[in-house]
Design a protein with these regions (language model features):
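Serine/threonine-rich, low-complexity intrinsically disordered segments
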Residues: 6-9, 25, 41
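Sec-dependent bacterial lipoprotein signal peptides
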Residues: 1-16
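Bacterial Sec-dependent N-terminal signal peptides
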Residues: 15-36
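Mature extracytoplasmic or otherwise solvent-exposed domains
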Residues: 29-198
């Protein structure tokens, strides 16, 4: 007799768990896989040369003065990637790219209005990128300068151009980032350096 009384309770609990208002990973309003602060490297880099050998000119390698090729996601979710030099590339140019994708809630405020009461708020996804074509020096060494991107470098918008957009504190998420170095003459997608998350 007890088991027949529990069936309606179990059905009700199941219905509540499956409702649109139930808390689930897809209904929390933030990306499921955001990138945490930390240091990231190319998992496919050859430990001796520091790069993906198959995707670089024969004999290419990090110089002895170079530290590891790495990108650091800082606590403010900006990204800083290290400088390094690759010797043995001959006259082969390379294309370097650092791109990050973010989500945030943007609060639009009227200048002089109380910033705790935004006029309008909206969630947005945006990206910021830095890229360059690099040419090796006369000795066949490619110097790759430090690169960085920040979510605060990207201009945000509001429906009214007189309103001031501001990223709401605590709402910023780094969804993904990709740092890549591609040598001319190699197939698209074959990178000598590739650091990406997630």
């Amino acid at each position: 007799m007890r088991s027949t009384r529990l069936i309606p309770v179990a059905v009700l609990a199941f219905a509540v768990a499956c409702s649109d208002t139930a808390t689930s990973p897809t209904s929390v309003g933030v990306p499921l896989f955001d990138v945490a602060a930390g240091t990231y490297t190319d998992p496919l880099a050859d430990p001796q040369t520091g790069i993906q050998d198959a995707n670089a000119p024969s004999g290419a390698h990090l110089t002895n003065q170079s530290g590891p090729v790495q990108c650091v996601v800082n606590s403010d979710l900006s990204i800083s990637c290290s400088a390094y030099s690759i010797a043995g590339v001959g006259n082969t140019n390379a294309f370097l790219s650092l791109e990050a994708v973010y989500t945030a809630i943007i609060d639009c405020n009227n200048p002089g209005n109380n910033k705790n009461n935004p006029i309008e708020s909206h969630e947005t996804t945006f990206s910021t990128e830095e890229s360059a074509t690099l040419t090796p020096g006369r000795n066949g060494t490619l110097r790759v300068g430090a690169r960085s991107v920040s979510p605060f470098d990207e201009a945000q918008g509001c429906p009214n151009p007189n309103w001031q957009p501001e990223i709401r504190e605590g709402s910023l998420e780094l969804v993904s980032f990709t740092y890549s170095l591609h040598f001319d003459g190699f197939p698209a997608g074959d990178f000598a350096v590739l650091i990406e998350q997630p």
